[in-house]
From Swiss-Prot:
Native source species: Geobacter sp. (strain M21)
GO cellular component: cytosolic large ribosomal subunit
Keyword Ribosomal protein carried by entry: yes
Protein's UniProt keywords contain RNA-binding: yes
Identification of the protein by name: Large ribosomal subunit protein bL25
Pfam family, one: Ribosomal_TL5_C
Amino acid sequence: MSKQVLKVELREKTGKGICRRLRAAGRVPAVVYGKGITPVSISLGQKELSEAIAGEGGRNHILTLECAGELNGANVIVADLLRDSLRNQPRHVDLHKINLADKVKVHVKLNLVGTPAGVKAGGFLDFAMHEIEVECLPVHIPAHINVDVTELLIGHSVHVGEIAAPIGTAILSDPKAAVVSILGRKAVAEEEAAPAA
């Protein structure tokens, strides 16, 4: 997984008014927490944060903080990100301080590979689970996990337990949960009729 330096500023004052002023100045209020530390309020540039979490790995990039004080050089990952519903810009972020030698639990996006045989035969793809939870060392966090669906027929599904865990990772999500299914026309019609009943 990639590592990126992120310049942040410590903030002593908190509250709605302070956060509003930070956002108006192009900054995002944030909190850093983790094992053995007291939560620390910081702010960071909106543009820098957006660039840091853009791309394939998304929120799972390892970020190294650059600031005054004890947090300088700390490695973090995004634990929670609140976005503006209209402009989709970050409004607040929780950062989890990590130790590169300790395993972390993260959600990783699933990437469907191929066109299912069932879709070619007239079925419909139902992509129910877009990400799964994995546990691994931070350096082994995958950008995404590929799921090959080319052989998937109408009426069949791929479950979490059928997904191969990338090297160095353990999949924590329910192995019985359906990730993707191919539905026939009758099944789709029944699903559409069910909410109306």
